[in-house]
Amino acid sequence: MRNTFIVCWQYLRAFALIYLCLLAGNAVSALLPFTIPGSIIGMLVLFTLLASQILPAQWVKPGCHLLIRHMALLFVPIGVGVMNYYDLVSQQFGPIVVSCLISTFIVMLVVGFSTQIMQRERAMAGDRTPPKDNE
């Protein structure tokens, strides 16, 4: 029984923290003079809290694992909602496909170059050979 309460508390805490970051992102988004979705700002707030270790990752991990496990199910309402605009989507199908292909290619380039740079830096940091004297 006690274990059940602990697990429920962990899930409740995780979802509350994720939701508080979303609310903070929405509040910041409403104050900005330009448009950035509040959910994006909320994710950045959550990332900042986790990266600076202000918020322990263990506190949000149960909720994140549950959301990731059921992520495909969460996209069903979006897919159904897009079908309300089938005429518009079918008219703009070409530009949508082109933008998806171009953005995919750009992401692949950025990831490739970033990986090469990180591997190069890791190889230099891992090189523990003493410097050679030029005599």
Swiss-Prot record:
Primary subcellular site in the record, as a coarse category: membrane
GO cellular-component term (any): plasma membrane
Subcellular location per the Swiss-Prot or TrEMBL entry: Cell inner membrane
Key words, A-Z: Cell inner membrane, Cell membrane, Membrane, Transmembrane, Transmembrane helix
Transmembrane regions: 5-25, 30-50, 63-83, 93-113
Pfam families linked: LrgA
Membrane topology: Multi-pass membrane protein
Family, as annotated: Belongs to the UPF0299 family.
Keyword Cell membrane: yes
Organism for this UniProt entry: Pectobacterium carotovorum subsp. carotovorum (strain PC1)
Protein name: UPF0299 membrane protein PC1_1498
Stored InterPro entries: LrgA/CidA, Uncharacterised_UPF0299
